[in-house]
């Protein structure tokens, strides 16, 4: 049976099962603010752990860093964010709604089912002309009466210290990358790494988006998983292709359906002025294709900017050739919230069972599941033995314990939150030290000795 996956179903499951709640809900919420609940925080942490494992732990090239969110204002001047990090905005003269011009065009073309990829890189005049020519209406009131397009800086501004003046002005970082670039020399010096090498970081970023939406896909506060991979100029396109393929295979290895993924190459007019090549790995959400991962060849732009603005020498001296150069940088940048949402959508399933029964199941890769197993005593009289098994397994995995309701209803609850294995403690357990372990996806059951549980589950959840 083909299941219709809608955002309404995903949002309802996320809220009802403790994955994601609306932020500040008891005060009426805050637009596009979301809190990860008890299951959501485990799930998202598992996504981050999987990325760190493959991009840092198992990589002979890469090291980690955790840079500060608040940085010297000059960092953002050097990077170009103070002067150029902006969205093209228009105001509706009828209802005063503020709209992103490029998104108006992209949504209009998507509704027409036209083969249109992006309005990135268009000038203000091109955007306005297209909107006027096609009589694109305001999504809020339906009228076509817009102001001219103008740029709006996306950075959140605040002040450090007791005075609010230009000298104390700082920003919440709009990306994690700059914290890596300014620590390039520190990492080279302390790790004694040679080219090529990379620096990875997971952290929060903030952008004052005008049109956030689609649940956790586009929010003003979000988490990034970024790698800045430095290499010798001339080898950059080779490494660009390497990290593009590595990133693609990472998603497939965690179970995302290949049919729901695509690689979109940026056209020349879309490229950032510093970029030599950029591709996006996109996922087919219920609301359409959306970017998960951007892989860009940033050349030596960032290191050169920071070297020029700071006056510090950021060149690399090759110890084997004595050649001195500014490394080029390949950046695979992944949104943690976006890819977590993609895993949720992809895993969601509804299954018709024999006897007219049905179930909702999250077919998450076991490495990503919030709980790796659930301990289910057949009756409450078996609680002591069940808690003994729980205590043993919880030293190795995050496991659930549930003794409320029929065993069938407990199976359904665990299916819906993605628990790959349910372990039932029954009266035979007291006699022969064995338990029944049920597979989430196939619903097959086998009998296994308690002493073998850790090994069995470890092999199944390995990634």
UniProtKB/Swiss-Prot annotation:
GO terms for molecular function: ATP binding; catalytic activity, acting on a protein; glycine-tRNA ligase activity; protein dimerization activity; transferase activity. This is Glycine--tRNA ligase. Catalyzes the attachment of glycine to tRNA(Gly). Substrate binds at residues 100, 175, 222-226, 331-335. Homodimer. NCBIfam families: glyS_dimeric, PRK04173.1. The keyword Aminoacyl-tRNA synthetase applies. GO terms for cellular component: cytoplasm. It holds the Pfam family HGTP_anticodon. CDD domains: GlyRS-like_core, GlyRS_anticodon. Belongs to the class-II aminoacyl-tRNA synthetase family. It is an enzyme of class 6 (ligase). ATP binds at residues 207-209, 217-222, 291-292, 335-338. It is found in: Cytoplasm. GO terms for biological process: glycyl-tRNA aminoacylation. Its EC number is 6.1.1.14. The gene is glyQS.
